[in-house]
Structure formats: structure tokens, C-alpha cells
Amino acid sequence: MKITDAAFYISAAALSGLPDLQIPEIVFAGRSNVGKSTLLNSLAGIKGLAKTSSTPGKTRLINFFLVNKAFFFVDLPGYGFAAVGHEQHEAWKKLLTTYIERRSAITLVVLLVDSRHPAMQSDREMIDYLTYLGKPYGIVLTKDDKLTQSQRIKARRVMESSALNAEFIVNYSSFSSKARLELLAHLAQYIR
């Protein structure tokens, strides 16, 4: 798949704010600061498409990006960020679970996992949740460039044993065009 056009479309703080377009949605989920926005910028080839920050919890809305005028990339707020109040945390959790459970346009959930910490409890819980829902999901091991080759292999093996139902597992660095092309090839299968 080649991305020729990508632009921010809308942010939603509630289900009522979701776009009405009935086009495929590929959802990017993961812990806070795992690199979701960086990955979206890398995939689209547009620096600054999705706002990035070194501060965890910066993405606080469901952000939709229209790609090739044919489908959405959806950037979810990260989970596991504790610096928000309990009420805010519960509101996000309800919004995200309702969105993932009820949104029929979702064709794939891409779960980003920090390759330096591939066995986090919150990531395993998300894998179990997606498996329970029967949602197709793939795993992207981010920040791959920060590992040695043996650490990459170990991280991948951990994910292969944890995510038995994953459609794919990709080791990803935003500096690698090979990883980008591999991931785009997987995503192309979910754009109907």
C-alpha cells in the first residue's frame, strides 16, 4: 500500500463526536508514550501529522486521520498513564472500550508495545480484551532501534508467546523503511 495523502480529520471526546463516514478504521492503541503518534507520522511520511510529545498522556482525544481519502488511521489516548484523576481515567476507559466494542467500521486494532518492555501487564490485558472481543489485531514492537539484535529476538519471542491470535507482529523503528513497508503491507489487507 502506498500512502499518497493523509490529513487530520477530527478529534472526538465522546462517541457522539465520531465521524459519520462509513469507511474502514485502523485503530492504533498502546500505553502512553509508546510511540503511537510517531508511528502514524512515519507511516504517512508526514512529519507533524499527529502531534508528538515526550510527556506521557498528551493525546487525550480519539484523533482521526483521513488517509488516501479512503480510510482512517485512529490514534487513541494511551493507557497506563496515572497523572490524571480517577474520574478522567474512568471516563477515558469507558469511551475507549465503548468505541472499540461498538464501532463496526474498525477493521483492525494495531497494538503498539514498547520493545524494551514487551511483557507489561497492561499490554497483556489489552491482548486478552481484543481476543475476547474477537477483534483482529496486530502487534507493532516500537523503539526497535534502541535494542541489540539479541534483545529484538527476545522481545519478539515474548510477544509471539503472549499474542497467539495476533494477525502479525512487526519490529518497528521509524528510521527503517523496511519496517514501514512491511507494516503497510499488513495494513493494506484491512482496507476493504
From Swiss-Prot:
List cellular component terms (GO): cytosol
Chain sites annotated for binding Mg(2+):
37, 59
Per the UniProt entry, what are the Gene Ontology biological process annotations, in alphabetical order?
Answer: division septum assembly
Locate the EngB-type G domain: which residues? Answer: 22-192
Q: Which family does it belong to?
A: Belongs to the TRAFAC class TrmE-Era-EngA-EngB-Septin-like GTPase superfamily. EngB GTPase family.
The organism of origin for this protein: Chlorobium phaeobacteroides (strain DSM 266 / SMG 266 / 2430)
InterPro entries given in the database record: G_ENGB_dom (IPR030393), GTP-bd (IPR006073), GTP-bd_ribosome_bio_YsxC (IPR019987), P-loop_NTPase (IPR027417)
Give the Gene3D superfamilies listed for this entry.
P-loop containing nucleotide triphosphate hydrolases
For binding GTP, which residues are annotated in this chain's numbering?
Answer: 30-37, 57-61, 75-78, 142-145, 172-174
Looking at the Swiss-Prot or TrEMBL record, what is one Pfam family this protein matches? Answer: MMR_HSR1
Name this polypeptide is given: Probable GTP-binding protein EngB
Protein encoded by which gene: engB
Instruction: Enumerate the UniProt keywords alphabetically.
Output: Cell cycle, Cell division, GTP-binding, Magnesium, Metal-binding, Nucleotide-binding, Septation
